[in-house]
Regions:
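Surface-exposed, glycine-biased beta-strand/turn segments
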Residues: 19-94, 101-106, 114-121
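Sec-dependent N-terminal signal peptides
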Residues: 4-15
Length: 121
C-alpha cells in the first residue's frame, strides 16, 4: 500500500499527458530543416520560435498546423515583417507565422483595405 499511492499518482499523470497530447501537422510540404530553434540565444534575447528553412526558395506555401482562426494580422518593416497569428480554440494555443513573403489574396485584400481606411502604410 505504501507504494500504491505514488504509483497511482504517476499513472494518472502519465495517462493525463497521453490524453492531452497534441498532434499538429507540419506547416510545410517539404522536409523541415530548422535555421533557428526555440530558446536559442541571440545577441540580445532568446529566440521565441522556430525558423524553418525553405530549401532556398522564397514564397513556399505554408498551412495551418491545426484547425483555428486568424486572430491577428500585422505588417511591419522590422521584427516579424508580415505575420499571421492563428488561434486554436481546441487547445488554447496560438501559432505564429512570421517573416512571410506574401499573404494569401484574401488576407492581402483585407490588409490593404485596412491600410487605406487608417491611411497608414
Amino acid at each position: 500500500m505504501k507504494f500504491f499511492k505514488p504509483f497511482l499518482l504517476i499513472a494518472i499523470l502519465l495517462i493525463n499527458q497521453c490524453v492531452l497530447a497534441q498532434s499538429y501537422t507540419p506547416p510545410v510540404d517539404f522536409s523541415m530543416l530548422l535555421s533557428g530553434t526555440f530558446g536559442e540565444l541571440r545577441s540580445n534575447h532568446f529566440h521565441a520560435g522556430i525558423d524553418i528553412k525553405t530549401e532556398g526558395v522564397e514564397g513556399q506555401k505554408i498551412r495551418a498546423i491545426a484547425n483555428g482562426y486568424v486572430s491577428r494580422i500585422k505588417v511591419s518593416s522590422w521584427g516579424y515583417g508580415k505575420v499571421i497569428y492563428l488561434t486554436h480554440p481546441e487547445t488554447g494555443h496560438t501559432s505564429v507565422y512570421a517573416h512571410l513573403k506574401a499573404f494569401s489574396d484574401r488576407i492581402d485584400y483585407l490588409v490593404k483595405k485596412e491600410h487605406y481606411k487608417k491611411e497608414s502604410f
